Amino acid sequence: MKKLLVALSLIAGSLTASAQWGRPVDYAAGPGLKDAYKDYFTVGVAVNKFNISDPAQTAIVKKQFNSVTAENAWKPGEIHPKEGVWNFGLADSIANFCRENGIKMRGHCLCWHSQFADWMFTDKKGKPVKKEVFYQRLREHIHTVVNRYKDVVYAWDVVNEAMADDGRPFEFVDGKMVPASPYRQSRHFKLCGDEFIAKAFEFAREADPTGVLMYNDYSCVDEGKRERIYNMVKKMKEAGVPIDGIGMQGHYNIYFPDEEKLEKAINRFSEIVNTIHITELDLRTNTESGGQLMFSRGEAKPQPGYMQTLQEDQYARLFKIFRKHKDVIKNVTFWNLSDKDSWLGVNNHPLPFDENFKAKRSLQIIRDFDAAMDNRKPKEDFVPNPMNQPGQEYPMVNSEGYARFRVEAPDAKSVIVSLGLGGRGGTVLRKDKNGVWTGTTEGPMDPGFHYYHLTIDGGVFNDPGTHNYFGSCRWESGIEIPAKDQDFYAYRKDINHGNIQQVTFWSESTGKMQTANVYLPYGYGKVVKGKQERYPVLYLQHGWGENETSWPVQGKAGLIMDNLIADGKIKPFIVVMAYGLTNDFKFGSIGKFTAEEFEKVLIDELIPTIDKNFLTKADKWNRAMAGLSMGGMETKLITLRRPEMFGYWGLLSGGTYMPEEIKDPKAVKYIFVGCGDKENPEGINKSVEALKAAGFKAEGLVSEGTAHEFLTWRRCLEKMAQSLFK
């Protein structure tokens, strides 16, 4: 059992962090967002009373953020509910927390139609006051708040949401149809017109001569609202109103906005201000709004995986645009600390910390960006993937390793390709006006073969443009990224080729027919000096989720053998590739895996069948066993238990051998271990050194630029084969 666990741990170590056999990942490990973005902009968060009093929550705030906004405590209706009545308790607590921890604040907000101190509009008898009285009260409010907190505040949302939403271009006033006003028809506007905006900024500048004064609003990416905001701010600034910047509320969702609309808004506002803040960022899972949000509240439910991918991708796209415009974007503020705090409801899963204040993968994606990739564009030399269906142009690959996809699904809301970078679960495609979804991987893929599938609105489908390949216990789409050294597995017209035959045999131990594919070298069966030549045999195993087709097709084992034989690098031998019973194994029961079931099939049923029906040299010194990944685990377990059966052993991303595990050093002539350089290269090198020091003939390969994937294993087979049966 100890040997088994060692093998399993080595394979687990070759996988990415998020895939290591279900191990939890601490996505908060590493620098805080404020540190990751120190050369770009400040990163902030809106807080409530719990966020600044609970030690676990305050630790998150202090590590991740260098800007804080009071979610509600500073809003006029909260802090100044009645004339002469001030609720400074929570407001002071938040300000003092920031003072004590050296965190600057955004002051939100001084004047807003909602959560406002509505008493300012009426006298003690409830009758409307004149605008002069309103202005006097508003000035007193602004001066009191600003003077109390300006030592810790660097920017103020002076006026919030004063512009009308997109809607009808006309409205009825006094029974007449007139062009709709660009302004929200608030009590402020009805009393004062747009002058209240100018007055609020004038009062704020009086109180804080150096603070950054912002106009803040939502739906800034909508063309109509964007232009209304632009025109208002431009008009005000031309009149001398001290508006320093625009706050773009980021209440977005996983489908909207796209980069083009967001960038248009940023560029448009940059024409009139040199400071933009993304003030209220969250990404709702659905498109609910208003009263519909009640359906996202209550007990937390898991976020569907594909929606998580969409959300992570949207966060990555947004922050890429934010970084691009760091010259004008000075702050990005998340609206709340966790899903539990969010006004959108916990089941919208809108923030990088979940309802238990645990970091999500989206935090890691936002933080661990690659600045070099921000402006990188693929070379436009795309050609059809060599594994495409006849006549199909997509998917395409280019010389750098990028992949490009095209899917027709006009009624779909989302299409995801399960290939891509950044740990985001794939490449999210975008739909054009014709209902065609297209997209390109964020960066170059590792060269070689990759499985993938499409997720369309949560359903899993294969790409109709390419052939299907068995992996992950199902038929998947496949794509081949060109490799610099691909000639060793390329089809060559100038040489003779062997063939691959399918063999079926009855397995008494499993009670069913089993299948194997057998590679026979060119010339097999020919009579030489009056008798047929016999051949050594390599038993070559696939990994978890695969089957007997994997090595012949994805692994290109036959072509690798043909090319080695033609170049005189090896003498011909047979390769048997059988289903290894791996796919009944369930993650979570790893300690129970012994490979004993396949050992019975292999030793008692398959080998006798092969020796009976093919021209084999039927002894251990002419028999080898090797396997990739879980097939490597099987290889290690079986060769150590049954050393009398195999004289050559090979593990391909399937763990390592150590001298102390092998009871009889004379039991094996040659040991091979290999993996990709993104897996466990240290383990491979250590194993080879130890085996050689103990007197074993051992060889290793660390595949350059690859991970747990077929180019690694093709390279391993090519190298290992040259040392077998010698």
Curated annotation (Swiss-Prot):
Residues 370-726 are annotated as: Feruloyl esterase. PROSITE patterns: GH10_2 (PS51760). Induction: By growth on ester-enriched corn oligosaccharides. One of its GO terms (biological process) is xylan catabolic process. SMART domains: Glyco_10. GO terms for molecular function: endo-1,4-beta-xylanase activity; feruloyl esterase activity. InterPro entries: AB_hydrolase_fold (IPR029058), Esterase-like (IPR000801), GH10 (IPR044846), GH10_dom (IPR001000), Glycoside_hydrolase_SF (IPR017853), Ig-like_fold (IPR013783), Ig_E-set (IPR014756), Xylase_Ferestase (IPR049642). It catalyses: Endohydrolysis of (1->4)-beta-D-xylosidic linkages in xylans; feruloyl-polysaccharide + H2O = ferulate + polysaccharide. Optimum pH is 6.0 for xylanase activity. Pathway: Glycan degradation; xylan degradation. Pfam families: Esterase, Glyco_hydro_10. The active site is at E161, E280, S629. Residues 27-369 form the GH10 domain. Its EC number is 3.2.1.8, 3.1.1.73. Residues 1-19 form the signal peptide. Gene3D superfamilies: alpha/beta hydrolase (3.40.50.1820), Glycosidases (3.20.20.80), Immunoglobulins (2.60.40.10). Keywords: Carbohydrate metabolism, Glycosidase, Hydrolase, Multifunctional enzyme, Polysaccharide degradation, Signal, Xylan degradation. Monomer or homodimer. In the N-terminal section; belongs to the glycosyl hydrolase 10 (cellulase F) family. The two catalytic domains appear to be functionally coupled. Involved in degradation of plant cell wall polysaccharides. Has endo-xylanase activity towards substrates such as oat spelt xylan (OSX), acetylated xylo-oligosaccharides and acetylated xylan, producing primarily xylobiose; cannot hydrolyze xylobiose to xylose. Also has feruloyl esterase activity, releasing ferulic acid from methylferulate, and from the more natural substrates wheat bran, corn fiber, and XOS(FA,Ac), a corn fiber-derived substrate enriched in O-acetyl and ferulic acid esters. Exhibits negligible acetyl esterase activity on sugar acetates. This is Endo-1,4-beta-xylanase/feruloyl esterase.
